[in-house]
Structures are given as C-alpha cells and as structure tokens.
UniProtKB/Swiss-Prot annotation:
It comes from the Viruses. Keywords: Clathrin- and caveolin-independent endocytosis of virus by host, Clathrin-mediated endocytosis of virus by host, Disulfide bond, Fusion of virus membrane with host endosomal membrane, Fusion of virus membrane with host membrane, Glycoprotein, Hemagglutinin, Host cell membrane, Host membrane, Host-virus interaction, Lipoprotein, Membrane, Palmitate, Signal, Transmembrane, Transmembrane helix, Viral attachment to host cell, Viral envelope protein, Viral penetration into host cytoplasm, Virion, Virus endocytosis by host, Virus entry into host cell. One of its GO terms (cellular component) is virion membrane. Homotrimer of disulfide-linked HA1-HA2. It comes from Influenza A virus (strain A/Herring gull/DE/677/1988 H2N8). It is a single-pass type I membrane protein. Its main location: virion. Palmitoylated. In natural infection, inactive HA is matured into HA1 and HA2 outside the cell by one or more trypsin-like, arginine-specific endoprotease secreted by the bronchial epithelial cells. One identified protease that may be involved in this process is secreted in lungs by club cells. This is Hemagglutinin. Major glycoprotein, comprises over 80% of the envelope proteins present in virus particle. The extent of infection into host organism is determined by HA. Influenza viruses bud from the apical surface of polarized epithelial cells (e.g. bronchial epithelial cells) into lumen of lungs and are therefore usually pneumotropic. The reason is that HA is cleaved by tryptase clara which is restricted to lungs. However, HAs of H5 and H7 pantropic avian viruses subtypes can be cleaved by furin and subtilisin-type enzymes, allowing the virus to grow in other organs than lungs.
Amino acid sequence: MAIIYLILLFTAVRGDQICIGYHSNNSTEKVDTILERNVTVTHAEDILEKTHNGKLCKLNGIPPLELRDCSIAGWLLGNPECDILLTVPEWSYIIEKENPRNGLCYPGSFNDYEELKHLISSVTHFEKVKILPRNEWTQHTTTGGSQACADYGGPSFFRNMVWLTKKGSNYPIAKRSYNNTSGEQMLIIWGIHHPNDESEQRALYQNVGTYVSVGTSTLNKRSSPEIATRPKVNGQGGRMEFSWTILDIWDTINFESTGNLIAPEYGFKISKRGSSGIMKTEGKLENCETKCQTPLGAINTTLPFHNIHPLTIGECPKYVKSERLVLATGLRNVPQIESRGLFGAIAGFIEGGWQGMVDGWYGYHHSNDQGSGYAADKESTQKAIDGITNKVNSVIEKMNTQFGAVGKEFSNLERRLENLNKKMEDGFLDVWTYNAELLVLMENERTLDFHDSNVKNLYDKVRMQLRDNAKELGNGCFEFYHKCDDECMNSVKNGTYDYSKYEEESKLNRTEIKGVKLSNMGVYQILAIYATVAGSLSLAIMIAGISIWMCSNGSLQCRICI
C-alpha cells in the first residue's frame, strides 16, 4: 500500500514535459563510415549494380554484328565460310567468339591486327566499296584460289581479295591506283604471298626477286616475298601476310608489283563512327534491348556504379571492383526504448528514436494535462531533405572521370606488353575502386554527422527558449516548472515561447524539496530510502509489541512513573 502511495506521490510531482527526438523505423539497412562499420540507418540507397540478365541484346534498338564462327579477319577478307557477312548493316557492337574457326583460311598473318580491331571498336558501320575490280587486271590471272579456302569442295579464295598470278608464262608489272572520292576515310587491305619454294614461285608468278609496293601520301611500304620451307598448315607450306591502312579523303593509294600481290577488290568506307566495341563471348543475340551491354549480359539500371565487367558499351554505370557501396540518406536507426519505469517516460534522442513520428526526421513529443503526442519539425526536416536529395548526383560528379577498359588485344609476340597492360589496368581499377569506396565512406560520415547536428540544433533551440523555466532531464527532454498547455507547447515548437509570461510561476516551483531531491536521485535510490525507513518502522513496532506482551504475562516488569 505504501508503494502505491509513493507512486502516486511521484506521479503527482511530475510536471509537463517536451522532448526532442528523431525518427526511427524497422529498417535493417546498414552502412559503413570512415569511423564505423555496419551502422544501422533509417534510410539508405544501394548505388552499386550487381546483376545482369545474362543476355546479349540490341543496344538502343540497334542489333550487334554477330560474327558467328568467323573472326574479324575472316569477315574483312571474305573467308568463304563467312559469306553471310559479305554485306552487313549498321551495328551497335560486335560479337566475336574467343576462338572462331574461320579466320585466315590460307595460313599466314595480319600485320597490326590488334590495332585494326581497336580501330573497329570506334566504328559502327562499314560500306563496302569496289575499288579495284578484278576484271580490270587484264594482263594477269585473277582466279587464283586454294583448297585451304575450299568452297563446295573446290578451291576458292577470300571474297574481297584478288590473288594475281601469271597469265600464260608472263607476269608483267601490275600497277593500279585508287583515289578516295567517297567523302569518308576508307579501310584498305592488301597482302603478299610467301611461297614454300622457288618452284612454287615460278609456277605462280614466273618471276623471282619480286616485290610489292604500296604508297599513299603518308605510307611508303615495299615488301619482298620470303621463300622458305615451312610446315604445312591447312595443306599449305606457303604463307600470306596481310597489311592495312586508312586512306584519307581525296588521297590516292598506288599498288605496284612484279609478283606475289594479293590485291584488294573492295575497300571499306567508314560511313559511321560511334562508341562500339568487340565483345569476346560465346553468347548469341537474344530478343531483348538494353542501354548498357557487357560480355556477361545486359545491365538495366539507374545506379551510378556496377561491378559486373570492366568492358561495357552504351550508357553504363561506372565500373568498380567493390562488392558493396551503400549510401546513407537517413539517420542512425536506434529503435525507441519502451522503458517507461515508474514515470512512463518517453525516451529522448539520447536513448533512441521514435517510430511514432512518421511525418518528419526530427521533432517533438510532449505530455501535459491535455494529453501527449508527436509532432515533426517541418523546417529542419525540409532543410535536411534538401541537403541530401542531390547526394547521389554529387558522388557521381566527384567521380566524373571514368577509367575505360577498352579490351586491348596483343599478339603472341607482345605478351610482356599484355601483362604490363593488364597490371596497369588492374592498378587503375584498384585506385578507382578505392576512390569510390572512400568517397562513400566520407559521405556517409558527413550524412550521419549532419543528422546528429540537426537534432542538437533543435535541442539547443528549445533550451535557449526555456532557459530556467524548465529543467533538462538528460535524455533529450525538458520538464517545465510551470503548467504548459497545448498552446504553450506549440509556441515552444514554433519558436514563439514567451519566457517572461511563465517566469514567476517557474520561480515558485523551482524551490528544491528538502531531503530527497527527485531531480537528481534515481528511482532505485528513492526505493532504497523508503525500504530503510519502512524497515526501521516495522522493527520499532515489533519491539513495542513484544514488550507489551512480556509485561502482560509478567515476564517483564513495567513501571510507569509520573
């Protein structure tokens, strides 16, 4: 019964209160900062795309060029197995298998092949133009072919090239020119044949000591065949060596040869340039569209970063090696502590956030004779929202120099360069990834500090208004020394609290209670004092009862003196 009286006493003593706090929810989102790991926040935004659809798709409505079982060389030279590629429309990117079967059917090499593929990565359409028609080589045989490039079981040759051999027993000097009047730059490919022995040389070209000369305003190349015995490839001991150049507008290319010339019948006008690329993959085009393509699959996202593949084509996020990039946009999420104790106190911002406040990030909880409730502080919440709205864009702007992995290729003789290039690219990507991760950590630290600062500013705003008309309870709450109805509470919230109006009432109520001061003593200390007093009183009553009983039965003599 005494405890009930004590609780009622404490309840009666408790004054009106206003608390400053912040929003919390059931979110389990976690972010990292410079100083902390796995900080639970109310709101966060994942800015790293980790998924793709596993498909090769049209890019912005334009299909890629599927080389199927052909290589770039097989396509450009016109391998008979690649006839489907003789005429191709505009492409968005090129799909080439890792090891296509149909390349140089007649064995040999392609000079600066990797550089050519790099050039093609910036082209989205070739227009094939006949530059040196085969029927104009009237003094030479133009039907040269090989079983290595068989077509329907018979010997054939690259469709876009002309293998010039002797006519009868003569091979007069072959001289032809082409002037580029197409209005665009043009890719020109030619070759030289290296026979297996001198008898093959005479059988094909009659002449020995031959040469092939090619010249433009910027090129002067003269080559001679290297006659040597070699192991047979595709049944051939000879080799063909192909070269290429870009012929500028109005420039002229001149060919001159006394034998062994593989002449171009067609050139490739670069009719459209764009951000293309060569995807090394075994995949095939599927019925889908995307704005961003990788060799592994298409990415459809609005996020600023991805970790899928360094080689991308289209409007793509920036590539990083990170496994996780989460940007904090909300506050630290500390669920409200529902520990009401003897007073039914509402936890303030020190103890935890409020799930009951749903219309803002920061705000108030008040309790008085008219009731209690939450109210968000619209002004501070809106300022915070404005400050964080463009945070993702800010991160992107700070990382606006994308490191591009262009998928360079190297020949077998350039392995050291390839390894060095790979190490450099890996190093750049490591630095790029570190910068992105560090930027996110710093932004998260700033965001959480920003929210903490806003809560503190709101607290200070209330404290400066109330001054000594209320006492700070140490948990984000103030207890008034005067009665504060709803109108009074609203004036505190909107910053129009009239200190002088309540000053006298507060002075009267600030008189400290002598003995036990509730303002600085905990519940357990109060209960301990109560228990001590109650125990002493019970002991005194017990001793008095025993004494009266002993006096009544004669065990104790009692004398009352007046």
